From Swiss-Prot:
Reaction(s) the record says it catalyses: L-lysyl-[protein] + O2 + H2O = (S)-2-amino-6-oxohexanoyl-[protein] + H2O2 + NH4(+)
Disulfide bridge positions per record: 83-147, 96-157, 127-137, 217-290, 230-300, 264-274, 350-413, 363-423, 394-404, 463-529, 476-542, 510-520, 572-624, 578-694, 656-672, 662-684
Glycosylation, residue list: 287, 454, 643
Source organism (scientific name): Gallus gallus
Protein name: Lysyl oxidase homolog 2
MF (Gene Ontology): calcium ion binding; copper ion binding; protein-lysine 6-oxidase activity
Keywords tagged on the record: Basement membrane, Calcium, Chromatin regulator, Chromosome, Copper, Disulfide bond, Endoplasmic reticulum, Extracellular matrix, Glycoprotein, LTQ, Metal-binding, Nucleus, Oxidoreductase, Repeat, Repressor, Secreted, Signal, TPQ, Transcription, Transcription regulation
Modifications made to the protein after synthesis: The lysine tyrosylquinone cross-link (LTQ) is generated by condensation of the epsilon-amino group of a lysine with a topaquinone produced by oxidation of tyrosine.
Cofactor(s) this protein requires: Cu cation; lysine tyrosylquinone residue
Ligand binding (Ca(2+)): 548-549, 721, 723, 726-727
Residues binding Cu cation: 625, 627, 629
EC number annotated for this UniProt entry: 1.4.3.13
Amino acid sequence: MEGFLGFNHNHCFIVLFFVSLSLAQYEHWPYLPGYPEPPPQVYQPPRRPADVPKIQLRLAGQKRKHNEGRVEVFYNGEWGTVCDDDFSIHAAHVICRELGYVEAVSWLPSSKYGKGEGKIWMDNVHCNGKEATLAACTSNGWGVTDCKHTEDVGVVCSEKRIPGFKFDNSLLNQIENMNIQVEDIRIRPILATYRKRVPVTEGYVEVKDEGTWKQICDKHWTMKNSRVVCGMFGFPSERKYNTKVYKMFASRRKQHYWAYSMDCTGNEAHISSCKLGNHLNVDTEKNATCDNGMPAVASCVPGRAFAPSSHSGFRKAFRQEQPLVRLKGGANTGEGRVEVLKNGEWGTVCDDNWNLVSASVVCRELGFGSAKEAITGARLGQGMGPIHLNEIDCTGFEKSLTDCKFNMESQGCNHEEDAAVRCNVPAMGFQNQLRLVGGRNPYEGRVEVLAERNGTLRWGTVCSQGWSTVEAMVVCRQLGLGFASHAFQETWYWHGDVSADSVVMSGVKCSGTEMSLAHCRHDGADVSCPRGGGRFGAGVSCSETAPDLVLNAELVEQTAYLEDRPMFMLQCAQEENCLASSAVNTSVTSGYRRLLRFSSQIHNNGQSDFRPKNGRHAWVWHDCHRHYHSMEVFTHYDLLNLNGTKVAEGHKASFCLEDTECEADVQKQYECANFGEQGITVGCWDVYRHDIDCQWIDITDVPPGDYLFQVVINPNYEVAESDYSNNVMKCRSRYDGQRIWMYNSVHNGANQDGDTEERFSAYWKLGNSILFSR
């Protein structure tokens, strides 16, 4: 790690780079704190016609992002809504620009953000998209409508704010609880110890207003305000700070204060949901003053994954000792499908009433900040098993999602409604240490890292020896580009910078959960790469989506049985190496093999289709199955003793991938017959029945006893998936020489129940595993 972040004081450009890493929170700024700011951009809004009344807008309701919500209009002293009749994206653009956003992304009819109250001010709204205000668009007239609040319209605005946007405060004295509208917000480190720390956790809270950064007076500042600000920057909680030190700093220079204070309740995910507080006094130079006060300071507590340690540094994504909540299927740190542990079994959360407040409880529980987005509709993949929680209602101050009010019944919910979150995470500056070069688009290219060599920081390649999809996943995550779709060990077709051809990183081995490639195991300064860099440098291609294969563990348990099969019926299987090595000594005419048979059903619960690694030209024809196999290693079936040693061999070696069955609204795309395209569609599953050739483990040589039965899907990570942790299924098995019992199946990482052995007596008399002979 040190080799990638070091610098030499003799090189000023290296010092600047180190500062930029230290102040990673400001990586998107055009300048660094302490340096002269560029002249503020002044936004010139379109002029409002004199005959058009002044209005104020806000986004309200059950938000899932801070920049979306039900459109509400303040007119004639009262808040009201807008009907969705004749509404268009042009009207949405006008609304978003009036609120300070660059443009609208979409609009939603039929009270998608909940029903409003009071007046419906506008109906049959028609805009051309260039109006200065929504009030300048045509409509039926103020309050003239035949709509109900079930038709309240909502909009989704771009996250980009208009540079230099000026907040119109002309109606401020008429409106109570007006929401905050600012261009941007930051925590600017003041003390030297925080200026050199990653992430930045303490400093002045500043807002960008009319293109200029301004401090906030602390006279009405509360810890609730700090909690909201800390949450926005990826921190789960706030803490007290040394006010005396900051007073000393504040007295040394003149401050430029924002004209308002903030009034947050503490459960907001973004300051745009907070209310404007008191209006400050304004001096003769048009600068707000903070009598006997100083700039407000926020001091934040980072989650464990982001708190630097002298021993481990920043390591893997945050994991609790005994987590009750986890995120699955997300591409980046701090995002994924929400799953909760109940009665020893992981289950999902239904998205009914899912909003930013509840999502923020999940994020803070896992050591992140507030929620950036409350995701609905299984957009980060569908889970399997039970749906544990529904209609969650959090106050925002709960320590865990399980402390919130919720409905235990999941009637009417299915996995197409699985809730997910995207959390605010601290800016660590990791993306500044890595780049992709030479690709056809920003999502692919040769991997180049910034490393210190001989006291100089320079770009270089990564040795491709042993480079796999797992390492590529870390690269894509570090750059914020989603999942890896491919890992490349040759990149001659991507021409990078010749000066960066030298290998600066070798021996890279990742677990897949790291936030940065530098956190993976590697050779450090002792680089060794016989192949060299250049054309053999490691490369990746990234994708915003990925498949996710999950085995139906219950079906394996239910269908397992033993069969004594004559050798003369196994000649084809022996040719495909589906039997144990001792089978060569078994008589073809009188011998038999004892087979543990079962069915497997492999679901694709991800966001994109699972396609084989090899193209059609590399598929292999199998006479026994009468079709082509696209993957030689797709699934491993193993019988292990209790210490994990493999005791049985001989199982299905290669596979054809197809859509055997699909959910009701999903159409099959892949089939093995007639040299068809192979793969598994999202929402479909591939079934390997217990009665097909090689769908077994040869246990002829296995003595009676207790064992572990294991199925591993995509064992070599040849194809990228959004979640590899659910690719392994294990279950306990007991074999008495004539019968076998399968029980207590779990996916990798899940906890087995403590009373398994006590319950085993109930399984002992089950008859679905009795020996069959042919």
